């Protein structure tokens, strides 16, 4: 009887761990540097990506480099990675190849980041606080692998692991959305302004499935 009750409890608890949650007006708070604390984002991505756009808001007072978004597949790390190298310097990795852009930033201050990549041309773009940076190019003709492990707060050196405290994120992340297309400049501006008129196809902050591991707290956004 006790075993039966235990299994019933597991069946009740597990769906809640991966519940689809509306996080509008909220953030994930990563209160410390660590090699363990992270959030796994859950999505059913069955096909490789030939186009993508990722947008998020972040607030951190770290001056060292850290991972903002880590997407790995079983066969390789850094399949898709957004990494902040230092104040005003951002890198996008596609298939372990990277491009880097630089922006003028106040430090510390909240930032809205969008990045996109188009396989047919290889063109990668960054938009910081609604303003476009100089375009870069990488991995023309490539396809980003499917069935990913997506992690916030840490940079993966293996599938879902291999974390390094010196690359961990400390601060707050919110309003994260991802599409399987390259958004137009007009659409990027709408996202920056907080519009929800452009429906995300991969990750949606207003209907997010996630799992928290370690010391990460969901709190109201007070700086957006």
From Swiss-Prot:
CDD domains with a match to the protein in the record: PTX
Listed GO biological process terms: host-mediated suppression of symbiont invasion; innate immune response; negative regulation by host of viral glycoprotein metabolic process; negative regulation of monocyte differentiation
Keyword Cytoplasm part of the UniProt annotation: no
One GO location term (cellular component): extracellular space
Residues carrying a glycan: 51, 166
UniProt binding sites for Ca(2+) 2: 155, 157, 167
Name listed for the protein in its UniProt record: Serum amyloid P-component
Species: Bos taurus (Bovine)
Keywords assigned by UniProt, alphabetized: Amyloid, Calcium, Disulfide bond, Glycoprotein, Lectin, Metal-binding, Secreted, Signal
């Amino acid at each position: 009887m006790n075993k039966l009750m235990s299994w019933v409890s597991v069946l009740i608890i597990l769906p809640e761990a991966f519940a689809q949650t509306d996080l509008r007006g909220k953030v994930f708070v990563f209160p410390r540097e660590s090699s363990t604390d992270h959030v796994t984002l859950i999505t059913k991505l069955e096909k490789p990506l030939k186009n993508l756009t990722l947008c998020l808001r972040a607030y951190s007072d770290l001056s060292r480099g850290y991972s903002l978004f880590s997407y790995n597949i079983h066969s390789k790390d850094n399949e898709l990675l957004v990494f902040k190298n230092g104040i005003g310097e951002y890198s996008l990795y596609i298939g372990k190849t990277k491009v880097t852009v630089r922006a003028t930033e106040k430090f510390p201050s909240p930032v809205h980041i969008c990045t996109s990549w188009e396989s047919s041309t290889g063109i990668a773009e960054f938009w910081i606080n609604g303003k476009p940076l100089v375009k870069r190019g990488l991995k023309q003709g490539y396809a980003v692998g499917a069935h990913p492990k997506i992690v916030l707060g840490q940079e993966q050196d293996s599938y879902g692991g291999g974390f390094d405290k010196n690359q961990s994120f400390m601060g707050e992340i919110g309003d994260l959305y991802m599409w399987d297309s390259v958004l137009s400049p007009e659409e990027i501006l709408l996202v920056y302004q907080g519009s929800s008129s452009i429906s995300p196809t991969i990750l949606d902050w207003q209907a997010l499935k996630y799992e928290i591991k370690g010391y990460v707290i969901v709190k109201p956004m007070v700086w957006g």
